[in-house]
Amino acid sequence: MPDLGLEVLLKGKNMVRLLGGLGVALKISAVSVLISLPLGILLGVLMTFKNPILKTILRVYLEFIRIMPQMVLLFLVYFGTTRAFGWDLSGETAAVIVFVLWGTAEMSDLVRGALIAIPKHQYECSEALGMSRAQTYWYIIIPQTVRRLIPLSINLITRMIKTTSLVLMIGVVEVLKVAQQIIEANRTASPNAAFGIYLTVFILYFLACWPISLLAGYLEKKWK
């Protein structure tokens, strides 16, 4: 049987350290999601307004965030702001800022798409029934939009969790960084440990994201 180096995880507190690193990744994701969801909803609603200047500004922001790789944004926020403005940002704070910028852009586009997908005749019918604009949104538009958005926003959460693997590049000790440290510390005693440890990291990410993906799929089928 091939030596996968899994015994390294049983030494000392290596497995506990890996789980702690996963906790850091999940914490960054959770904070970023909690901030970016309401901001994304607000910007998504604003993107449906007919003000050309506002739409242009928001579109430029959306395209900039989409085109720019997350790793470049991490370097720009973490290293660039430190040099340019003298800010003392921790790696985790810089990561949250970047993921909030990214998550807000993605969520705003989802909200915009969900709102413009509502047929115009529903607005017209509600107006014909004597409903105010606020009543139209509260009783007709928002319930439909929420049903469209929840599965998509849950998928955004899984994408954010997986993308946190990039934050090791700015020194955040998350699960992948811990895995590298364990491999380096045991390179001589267990030269084959890399495969087993990275396999464990894969399983941890899978266990973190799989239930969320199942929930998104279930809701999408239920509300289709």
Predicted features along the sequence, with ranges:
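Transmembrane alpha-helices and adjacent helix-loop boundaries
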Residues: 1-224
